[in-house]
Amino acid sequence: MDLNTINSMSYEQFLDTFGNIIERCPLVTAAIWSQQPFASVTELENRVFDFIESLPLAGKEGILRCHPDLAGRDLMRGTLTDESQNEQAQAGLTLLSAKEKETLGFLNLQYKAKFGFPFVICAKMSDKNKIMQELGSRLQNEQSEELQKGIAEVKKICHLRICDLFLNEKLPTKL
């Protein structure tokens, strides 16, 4: 896919193509469509990030709430988005032992109870051990710090998803 193709897309085509660059949050894609044409992939990405940063606190929390629990209910039910399914599988979250599932489930519950949104990490750039370690560590953070960290992870996920769409090739999974 090239930039000319993107810039000539109808609203529906754009939404179909980019609607999940922010997990289950097509509103972001809908909002930036009218900012075409994009001079570069970086500009498209920056428009997404600017939109997210312009949101009030409740909007940013809403974006985080659109993310599924890692190795959670949606994974078990098979209701993850294709992108999340692939990202969680790549991180080894589809192959957890019973003990690992229990530990991750417990940490996910603690995290949601404390912060009011699920733990978000760029699974594609991580693995199950790092994810559990990071989840335990981030439970010690304050609300404002965790909101910033969560949004930073959303941006990493978005970046990799945009790259996948534009480059249509396998990208490095660890930065």
From Swiss-Prot:
It catalyses: 5-hydroxy-2-oxo-4-ureido-2,5-dihydro-1H-imidazole-5-carboxylate + H(+) = (S)-allantoin + CO2. It is found in: Peroxisome. This is 2-oxo-4-hydroxy-4-carboxy-5-ureidoimidazoline decarboxylase. Signal peptide: none annotated. GO terms for molecular function: 2-oxo-4-hydroxy-4-carboxy-5-ureidoimidazoline decarboxylase activity. Substrate binds at P68, S84, Q85, N86, E87, Q88, F119, V120, I121, C122, A123. It holds the Pfam family OHCU_decarbox. NCBIfam families: UHCUDC. The active site is at H67. Its EC number is 4.1.1.97. It comes from Xenopus laevis (African clawed frog). Belongs to the OHCU decarboxylase family. Its main location: other. Pathway: Purine metabolism; urate degradation; (S)-allantoin from urate: step 3/3. GO terms for cellular component: peroxisome. Catalyzes the stereoselective decarboxylation of 2-oxo-4-hydroxy-4-carboxy-5-ureidoimidazoline (OHCU) to (S)-allantoin. GO terms for biological process: allantoin metabolic process; purine nucleobase metabolic process; urate catabolic process.
